[in-house]
């Protein structure tokens, strides 16, 4: 498995997870402020990691 394939796969996985989190946040299924904070923190982390991977791929081109 080469690095570009791995990065693209990770970006796809990250984007899918972000969509699920956004659906949970907007769908009203959050039961507590603690769960809300955890999901928002996860979303921020996924955004950061996804952008770092995209930047690496862009520099590789």
Which sequence ranges carry the predicted segments?
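Short, charge-rich amphipathic interface segments used for partner binding and complex assembly
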Residues: 24-61
């Amino acid at each position: 498995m080469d690095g570009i394939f791995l990065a693209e796969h990770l970006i796809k996985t990250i984007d899918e997870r972000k969509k699920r989190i956004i659906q949970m946040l907007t769908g009203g299924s959050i039961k507590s402020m603690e769960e809300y904070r955890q999901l928002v923190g996860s979303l921020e982390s996924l955004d950061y990691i996804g952008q770092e991977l995209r930047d690496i791929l862009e520099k590789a081109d």
